[in-house]
């Protein structure tokens, strides 16, 4: 027990020194939580907890080393305590740091996968590869191999109805786009599995974390099957009401929603590894965070639903219809929004209804996040929470602007991709906000004063 306490005290000292260095060397705003001697009655009988949160500006600047040092939460708890914090990673601060870097890197890889998938769709490259192999395949490397692949594509409905007359060079472009998307996904599997195996062998991964990561890995492996299931729907002859082949909007929504779920799971888990405790300086701030959380949870749900509705806009190519704003053509609400039977189909397959839904949901998201900011602006809460709420409001405004610009300019690849990336960025901010609003552990709560004593710079 004494060895554990001594080790914990050493880790606390290192964390405090790192925070002190950050105050003198960083030009960015840093939010830290300091535990003074008055907060700790005895090193052997009371839990010691220190936590810090690096400001959003520094996060966006990409100062990874500083971020992990300042976001690390160090908890020193007696082995006999039943209220101790259960860490996801064993092996000390360095193990936490490297596991956190790996998980944040994996989340960033998934983010890039989502953006690359959007570019692949917007360049109409997704149906260029007419088969799929689980183990992967080499691209065509000879003229004969390219000719063979091109002939296979010529048998597809997309070539016959949309790209008839396409030359080989144009085909190579869309083929390479789809191939890159598939290989980037397989690369993610390797990038995730190898460090996972290493950390397991080192004994850093707890059972709880291992189960979580195994579930995410299984979901990621399933993404390949979902992706091919989606592409396969676009290789079939389209129904008569479609003028050109396209993948099923339901399958596209399933593919994108699964990708979002994997990203959110990885990002949340990474935060939990490097920041086991939320930033907390006082009981007043904890109570304020609880009030914000009551608003943040439903707002997060609205953000998620709006993002998924965007998948149906993409699946129905609805962004290339009604390219006016705020009206949809000459009217506020098109006449044909309920023309399909049964009625429910309109919300997922009717171009006019799908776009109207997305407009309404986007407006609701903007109002909801603005309302959250309004009702929390005078609350006594941690500065990190205030910064995140303000950043979320700003990102929402940017995302709405991107959406309207994409619509008015008839969905160019650049704006369409930026809009999709913006949706994931907004989800990221909501995840970060909700993670920061978690209730501290009982051991940390016991050590907190009623009112914050720390100074923030």
Swiss-Prot record:
GO molecular function annotation: metal ion binding; oxidoreductase activity, acting on NAD(P)H, heme protein as acceptor
User: What positions does the entry give for heme b binding?
Assistant: 358, 419
Q: Which reaction does it catalyse?
A: Fe(II)-heme o + 2 A + H2O = Fe(II)-heme a + 2 AH2
Q: Name one Pfam family in it.
A: COX15-CtaA
Entry's Gene Ontology cellular component terms:
mitochondrial inner membrane; mitochondrion
Record-listed heme o binding positions: 181, 255
User: In which pathway does this enzyme or protein participate?
Assistant: Porphyrin-containing compound metabolism; heme A biosynthesis; heme A from heme O: step 1/1
Transmembrane annotation, as ranges: 99-119, 187-207, 211-231, 256-276, 295-315, 358-375, 388-408, 413-433
Topology check: give the Mitochondrial matrix ranges.
1-98, 208-210, 277-294, 376-387, 434-457
Q: Which UniProt keywords apply?
A: Heme biosynthesis, Iron, Membrane, Metal-binding, Mitochondrion, Mitochondrion inner membrane, Oxidoreductase, Transmembrane, Transmembrane helix
Broad EC category: oxidoreductase
**What task does this protein carry out?**
Catalyzes the second reaction in the biosynthesis of heme A, a prosthetic group of mitochondrial cytochrome c oxidase (CcO). Heme A is synthesized from heme B by two sequential enzymatic reactions catalyzed by heme O synthase (HOS) and heme A synthase (HAS). HAS catalyzes the conversion of heme O to heme A by two successive hydroxylations of the methyl group at C8, in a reaction that involves matrix ferredoxin and ferredoxin reductase.
Task: Relay the domain remarks.
Answer: The N-half (TM1-TM4) and C-half (TM5-TM8) domains are connected by an intracellular loop. Each domain is formed from four-helix bundles and they align in a pseudo twofold symmetry manner. The N-half domain is the substrate heme O binding domain and the C-half domain is the cofactor heme B binding domain.
**Protein name per Swiss-Prot or TrEMBL:** Heme A synthase COX15
């Amino acid at each position: 027990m004494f060895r554990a306490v001594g080790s914990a005290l050493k880790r606390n000292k290192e964390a405090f020194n790192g925070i002190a260095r950050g105050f003198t060397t960083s030009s960015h705003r840093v939010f830290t939580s300091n535990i003074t001697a008055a907060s700790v009655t005895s090193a052997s009988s009371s839990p010691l907890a220190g936590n810090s949160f690096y400001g959003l500006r520094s996060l966006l600047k990409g100062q990874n080393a500083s971020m992990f040092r300042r976001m690390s939460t160090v908890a020193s708890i007696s082995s006999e305590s039943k209220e101790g914090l259960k860490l996801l990673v064993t092996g000390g601060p360095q193990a936490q740091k490297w596991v956190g870097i790996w998980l944040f890197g994996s989340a960033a890889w998934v983010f890039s996968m989502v953006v690359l998938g959007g570019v692949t769709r917007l360049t109409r490259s997704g149906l260029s590869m007419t088969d799929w192999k689980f183990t992967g395949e080499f691209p065509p490397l000879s003229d004969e191999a390219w000719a063979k692949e091109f002939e296979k594509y010529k048998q597809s409905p997309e070539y016959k109805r949309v790209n008839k007359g396409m030359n080989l060079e144009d085909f190579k472009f869309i083929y390479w786009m789809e191939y890159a998307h598939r290989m980037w996904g397989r690369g993610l599997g390797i990038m995730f599995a190898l460090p996972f195996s290493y950390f397991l062998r080192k004994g850093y991964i707890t059972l709880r974390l291992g189960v979580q990561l195994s579930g995410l890995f299984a979901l990621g492996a399933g993404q390949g099957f979902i992706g091919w299931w989606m592409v396969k729907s676009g290789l079939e002859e389209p129904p008569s009401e479609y003028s050109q082949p396209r993948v099923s909007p339901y399958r596209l929504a399933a593919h994108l929603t699964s990708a979002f779920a994997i990203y959110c799971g990885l990002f949340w888990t990474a935060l939990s590894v490097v920041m086991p405790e939320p930033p907390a300086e006082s009981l007043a701030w904890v109570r304020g965070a609880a009030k914000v959380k009551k608003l943040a949870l439903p707002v997060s749900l609205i953000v998620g639903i709006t993002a998924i509705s965007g998948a149906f806009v993409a699946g129905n190519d609805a962004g290339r219809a009604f390219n006016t704003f705020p009206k949809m053509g000459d009217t506020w609400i098109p006449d044909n929004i309920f023309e399909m039977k049964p009625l429910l189909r309109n919300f997922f397959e009717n171009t006019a209804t799908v776009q109207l839904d997305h407009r309404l949901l986007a407006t609701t998201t903007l109002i909801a996040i603005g309302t959250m900011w309004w009702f929390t602006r005078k609350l006594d809460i941690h500065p990190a929470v205030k910064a995140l709420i303000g950043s979320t409001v700003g990102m929402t405004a940017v995302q709405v602007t991107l959406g309207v610009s994409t619509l008015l300019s008839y969905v160019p690849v650049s704006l369409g991709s930026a809009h999709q990336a913006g949706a994931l960025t907004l989800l990221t901010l909501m995840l970060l906000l909700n993670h920061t609003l978690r209730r501290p552990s009982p051991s940390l709560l016991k050590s907190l004063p009623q009112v914050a004593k720390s100074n923030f710079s």
